[in-house]
Amino acid sequence: MMEQGVGANTVPGVTAPGNVYMIQARNPVAPGSKGQPVGMATYLTSRVTESDAGRANLQTPRVVIQNPAEVNATQGPPTALQHPTAVASLQTPPGEIQYSLGTTDLQTQPGGPQNPPTCAPGPMYTSNQFQWNMPFGSSFTFDPKKFIKDEVRTLGAIQILIGLTHIFTAINPSLYRQYSYSAISGYLVWGGIFFIISGSLSVEAEKDRSSCMVHGSVGMNVVSAIVSLAGVLLLLVDLIRNPVIDVKTVSGGLLPFVLLEFCLTCVVSHFGCQATCWNQFVNRTEVPTIVIANPANTPTGPFNATYSTTGHVNVITSSANPTSPTNAAAMVPPVPS
């Protein structure tokens, strides 16, 4: 049951359960002051919504409108809102104040007597928020270790041996008497020198891992690949066009080494180019993305508020200061009837 009384010196009583939360307005302003016109004192409204945790769904809210002892019936009626702690979320009709269990922050909007502060429903962001920084797109730098490994020294040593084989073969005078194309063109000499230089740079690059040394090794391997390709063509010409058995024997013995040199230089040049081209990602910027998560308790589902009157309680309200509106929540203990 509900009772309502209006008088100059009486405080009305409200029938409500024991768990009553009061939203009161403070800092009264006397009629006739600068903050309020003479003869017209408007108070911030506060609403009492009474609910019973034992009931499931009652759609019709019961609102008690009361006046303080100093205000007559023509002035603004203060109200208060009451809800039980057992209800997780209140789903009230449009215009009502909604609450979520575990949310303690109230968002108020500044205003005067005509625009009192109201509670804005929505997600409440508390101080205990977690933040994660998720960077997208990492900056890449040149890493010679991706190119220079233990195998590079072995490949360089093989290239040096192939170059020495070419030079030692060039000493044979019978190749020049039988008009060998590989010997007359000088491929056996300058080809062997290129192979020795590229192999030496590959071995040195394993010791000195500077970008300059790596670039030099890659460049010489590219040149050696071209030279070895030219040597393959010259040796094939000797095998096809020269009828002398000695020339065919020497050319056939060098051909596998030249093919091996071509394969080695192509492999080293390929991976070396990948290592040097890694520099194109150096100027790539890092873009972080901040993800903010609200760990506040959120309701698992909407519930309809229950409203009932089971006990007798006294409601005490005070007028509000329009210049600095504040809302305070107080719990009024039940008074036995």
Curated annotation (Swiss-Prot):
Coiled coil: none annotated. InterPro entries: CD20-like (IPR007237), MS4A (IPR030417). Signal peptide: none annotated. GO terms for cellular component: plasma membrane. Residues 101-121 are annotated as: Disordered. One of its GO terms (biological process) is cell surface receptor signaling pathway. Keywords: Membrane, Transmembrane, Transmembrane helix. The chain crosses the membrane at residues 155-175, 183-203, 220-240, 252-272. It is found in: Membrane. Pfam families: CD20. It is a multi-pass membrane protein. It comes from the Eukaryota. PANTHER family: MEMBRANE-SPANNING 4-DOMAINS SUBFAMILY A MEMBER 18, MEMBRANE-SPANNING 4-DOMAINS SUBFAMILY A MS4A -RELATED. Belongs to the MS4A family. This is Membrane-spanning 4-domains subfamily A member 18. It comes from Bos taurus. The lineage of its organism: Eukaryota, Metazoa, Chordata, Craniata, Vertebrata.
